[in-house]
UniProtKB/Swiss-Prot annotation:
Catalyzes the formation of 2'O-methylated cytidine (Cm32) or 2'O-methylated uridine (Um32) at position 32 in tRNA. GO terms for cellular component: cytosol. NCBIfam families: PRK15114.1, rRNA_methyl_1. It holds the Pfam family SpoU_methylase. It comes from the Bacteria. This is tRNA (cytidine/uridine-2'-O-)-methyltransferase TrmJ. It is found in: Cytoplasm. The keyword Cytoplasm applies. Its EC number is 2.1.1.200. InterPro entries: Alpha/beta_knot_MTases, RNA_MeTrfase_TrmJ/LasT, SpoU_MeTrfase, tRNA_m1G_MTases_N. It catalyses: cytidine(32) in tRNA + S-adenosyl-L-methionine = 2'-O-methylcytidine(32) in tRNA + S-adenosyl-L-homocysteine + H(+); uridine(32) in tRNA + S-adenosyl-L-methionine = 2'-O-methyluridine(32) in tRNA + S-adenosyl-L-homocysteine + H(+). GO terms for molecular function: RNA binding; tRNA (cytidine(32)/uridine(32)-2'-O)-methyltransferase activity.
Length: 241
C-alpha cells in the first residue's frame, strides 16, 4: 500500500534536501520519490545526507512537469504555508495521513512539496484536492523541506499501522477519477464555456479557478464525472445543429 504514495518535490534547488527527504521517507516506509524539474541533479552530497536511503534517490522518478508526476493519482495533496486569495479544502498532517492511506488501497496518492523559498504556485495548488497546512508555532513556523516531509511521512506511517490493526468490514469500493481524468474534464468544460460565450478564451478570469474549487470540494465519483462529460458532449452536439 505505501508504495502507492508518492512524495513529490517541485524544482528542488539543493541536493542535500533530496538526500534528507529520502531519509525521512524511508524511516517511515515510503520509497516512491518524484522530482519535478529539479534545478540540480542528485549527487554525492544527496547520497551522504540520505544516510542509507540512497536506494530511494537512485530509484527516484525525474519528470519535467507536475502533470506528469500526478498522472494516475486518485488523490493529490499540496503543501501550503501561505494564505491564498482563493480558499481551498484544507487538511492537517493527521488527516492527510488518514486520507492518503485510505486512498492508497485503490490508487496512487501524491503529496506535493514546493520550492524551498517560495513553495507551490497558485496554478500548481489548483491541481490538488486538498491543501496541507502544518500547524506550527505562529511566532516561529520555520520548517525546512525535509522536516515537513518527515512530519507528513510520520502521520502516514501512523495511519497505516492503525489501519493494519483494524478488522474492517468490506464495503462497496467507489472509484474516483484520477488527476489526469479531472484535467481532461476541466479542459472539456473550459472549451464548452468558451464556445458558448460564457467565458472569454483569452481571459477566463476567476471563473475556471472557482469551478476547479467547486469540483475539488465535491470530489465527484468516476461515474458522476462521466455523466458531467456526457452533458458537456450533449451541449456541444446541440450547439452544432
Amino acid at each position: 500500500m505505501l508504495e502507492n504514495i508518492r512524495i513529490i518535490l517541485v524544482e528542488t534547488s539543493h541536493t542535500g534536501n533530496m538526500g534528507s527527504t529520502a531519509r525521512a521517507m524511508k524511516t517511515m516506509g515510503l520509497t516512491n520519490l518524484y522530482l519535478v524539474n529539479p534545478l540540480v541533479q542528485p549527487d554525492s552530497h544527496a547520497i551522504a545526507l540520505s544516510a542509507g536511503a540512497s536506494d530511494v534517490i537512485g530509484h527516484a522518478t525525474i519528470v519535467d512537469s507536475l502533470d506528469k508526476a500526478l498522472a494516475g493519482c486518485g488523490l493529490v495533496i499540496g503543501t501550503s504555508a501561505r494564505s491564498r486569495t482563493l480558499s481551498w479544502p484544507m487538511v492537517e498532517p493527521r488527516e492527510c495521513g488518514e486520507r492518503s492511506v485510505q486512498q492508497a488501497e485503490h490508487a496512487s496518492v501524491a503529496i506535493v512539496f514546493g520550492r524551498e523559498r517560495v513553495g507551490l504556485t497558485n496554478e500548481e495548488l489548483q491541481k490538488c484536492h486538498y491543501h496541507l497546512n502544518i500547524p506550527t508555532n505562529p511566532e516561529y513556523g520555520s520548517l525546512n523541506l525535509a522536516m515537513a516531509v518527515q512530519l507528513v511521512s510520520y502521520e502516514i506511517r501512523m495511519a497505516y499501522l492503525a489501519r493494519q490493526d483494524k478488522t474492517e468490514q468490506k464495503t462497496d469500493e467507489v472509484e474516483y477519477p484520477l488527476a489526469d481524468d479531472m484535467e481532461r474534464f476541466y479542459h472539456h468544460l473550459e472549451c464548452v464555456l468558451n464556445d458558448s460565450g460564457f467565458i472569454r478564451k483569452a481571459h477566463p478570469g476567476q471563473i475556471m479557478n472557482r469551478l476547479r474549487r467547486l469540483f475539488t470540494r465535491a470530489r465527484p465519483e468516476m461515474q458522476e464525472l462521466n455523466i458531467l462529460r456526457g452533458i458537456l458532449s450533449s451541449v456541444e452536439k446541440w450547439a452544432k445543429k
